[in-house]
Amino acid sequence: PPERRKPREEGLRHCLQIGVEALKARKSPLDVVELVVRELENNEHFNAGIGSVLTNSGTVEMEASIMDGKSMKCGAVSGLSTVLNPISLARLVMEKTPHMYLAFQGAQDFAKQQGVETVDSSHFITAENVERLKLAIEANRVQIDYSQYNYTQPVQDDAEKELPVANGDSQIGTVGCVAVDSQGNLASATSTGGLVNKMVGRIGDTPLIGAGTYANELCAVSATGKGEAIIQATVARDVAALMEFKGLSLKEAADYVVHERTPKGTVGLIAVSAAGEIAMPFNTTGMFRACATEDGNSEIAIWPPA
């Protein structure tokens, strides 16, 4: 519906603008993807940060990951309930620890050590997400099973991932951003609140390097959709592997992974190559996505290309 679609489109337009401006100002792709995903985490219309959906206990457990293509350094976090911007904590894990992944209490303790901004967990609980949880509990479903009850198919987002929601609200998903600069340096970042009515402690594809997020010297990928399907197919890494080992173009690799390797209605992704090729395939009804190129061309869309 327009009242749900418009704020998301406006959010994508804003994020596209700040991302392009940052690249023009010679910010690194790593800086750019963190900046854009932070903006999405701060927008209650997306399922990350302030807009995160709720677990079956009515709590928030956020997760995120970030990866630099050239160095292949990466950082990931999950089980966060008080960190304002999970993507920035993921970057700190990458840059300030010998590890790649911190979760739950250990991640929140690390956030305090680093002086990361935290808030009371109630900050993340919105009326809209309380209602979503109520509907999911009444239907006795984790919000991923759209085979019954009035669930629409998942929609995904270039600046966000999408999962099904009751009453035609198909705008719950992960947010993600990929970027490449004029030197071909690449980066990817992904963040989410997960699934409506998920079990406490459930971890999806978003913080898993190679599943929801991946970047190397060939491409950067951020995936969205049903986390379990993305994990099983190692979606983000498979796109890069097909380019590396089979010599496929980015579009060929991304299309193959989405349309041949994953069940229909479960996956979408955004990807960019070192040469600046863009791919945004999805096998869901739609996917919120946006992209911009250095020549000034840009696109914001939901539905499949005509």
Curated annotation (Swiss-Prot):
EC nos: 3.4.19.5
Cross-referenced PANTHER family: L-ASPARAGINASE, N(4)-(BETA-N-ACETYLGLUCOSAMINYL)-L-ASPARAGINASE
Gene Ontology biological-process entries: proteolysis
This protein's record includes keyword Protease: yes
Similarity section: Belongs to the Ntn-hydrolase family.
Subunit structure, interactors included: Heterotetramer of two alpha and two beta chains arranged as a dimer of alpha/beta heterodimers.
Keywords for the protein's UniProt record, in alphabetical order: Autocatalytic cleavage, Hydrolase, Protease
Residues that, per the record, bind substrate: 202-205, 224-227
Active site feature: 174 (nucleophile)
Organism: Lupinus arboreus (Tree lupine)
Processing and modification events after translation: Cleaved into an alpha and beta chain by autocatalysis; this activates the enzyme. The N-terminal residue of the beta subunit is responsible for the nucleophile hydrolase activity.
Highest taxon of the lineage: Eukaryota
Known function: Degrades proteins damaged by L-isoaspartyl residue formation (also known as beta-Asp residues). Also has L-asparaginase activity, which is used to liberate stored nitrogen during seed development.
Enzyme class (EC, first level): hydrolase
InterPro entries (UniProt xref): Ntn_hydrolases_N (IPR029055), Peptidase_T2 (IPR000246)
Residues under site feature: Cleavage: 173-174
Name of protein: Isoaspartyl peptidase/L-asparaginase
